[in-house]
């Protein structure tokens, strides 16, 4: 997996997402003796007051340490969950502060007042170089998701400079992402820079052959990515529930499988235009019900029996997709091949994880999307992937060709 690059030089890629100019990077920011406000993504799973998965926290450590080594004090700012009516205990970042302290190996002061309050301002003004504070959930502020001008001003007072290192939130035009950036000297953190560079390669400078694997339940969720990438790729392998919309569009029988009838014409059009590039499953694992203990059997993907539903790609397709990946120079995988949560329908996803992982040193490989990331971690191949994206919605919007407000703000 790609490490973070806190000493990153300006990106050589000319990203349209960043207004055609590279983002400002940390080495261009003078931080000695300054208080730096850092937007991180600490929207992590918490159970019984304890962080269950600290991946996003550890991913932010190199940027924080670089700032501390440069003589700064650091004020960390994040959202957590979707609180609707101001402060709620279950959405407090307090338990996260302890996990950040552990990851950094130093004390992190938690500031429980609202981020835009006078109390918070006084608390951060007392920080000395080398010290770190974590603000309370920025979504407790009513103006955050509205990119409220008054809140932007209040947040800007918390730092002498601003660093955006929350790629997972870079597609949101919120106060803590793009609003405050216009008020302070700013730069992209190492995590944001590595994400934009890695995904930028998929759009602007892919080596060929270029193979993309797209899975997941719905065509409608991924259609803009599919349409934007198809002209650029050599092969696109389709899996997951969305495969049945394509198979039905081609006249196949799909039984009770998931289908989006309102996407059939679109799927038909893509098959007519890019049929030579689009690879669909030839067999599927069908089940008599949507359950972990369902009866299952392997059938042709376009002959799912009535009353049955396809829940994974079959063994022939697994082999065909592994073969299609051989010789590739660039590979992007987003979305599971089947109902990965049920063990008996996880084989297709695991097979793709193994195939992508086996390409180390032969191809530039990027994996994005929660289930595909879980699968690559579970397969033990994560360290063989060039870049594992933490982005979710932000990754997809970038690959749709959209400008991300946070990335634009860092130019």
Swiss-Prot record:
Subcellular localization, as worded in the UniProt entry: Cytoplasm
Binding-site residues for substrate, renumbered to this chain: 41-43, 56, 79-82, 139, 172
Stored InterPro entries: Phosphoglycerate_kinase, Phosphoglycerate_kinase_CS, Phosphoglycerate_kinase_N, Phosphoglycerate_kinase_sf
GO biological process: gluconeogenesis; glycolytic process
Keyword check for Ribosomal protein: no
Gene Ontology terms for molecular function: ADP binding; ATP binding; phosphoglycerate kinase activity
GO-annotated cellular components: cytosol
Region (Disordered): 1-24
Enzyme class: transferase
Domain of life: Bacteria
Catalytic activity: (2R)-3-phosphoglycerate + ATP = (2R)-3-phospho-glyceroyl phosphate + ADP
Pfam family, one: PGK
Record text on subunit structure and interactions: Monomer.
PANTHER family: PHOSPHOGLYCERATE KINASE, PHOSPHOGLYCERATE KINASE 1, CHLOROPLASTIC-RELATED
Protein name: Phosphoglycerate kinase
Taxonomic source organism: Deinococcus radiodurans (strain ATCC 13939 / DSM 20539 / JCM 16871 / CCUG 27074 / LMG 4051 / NBRC 15346 / NCIMB 9279 / VKM B-1422 / R1)
Gene: pgk
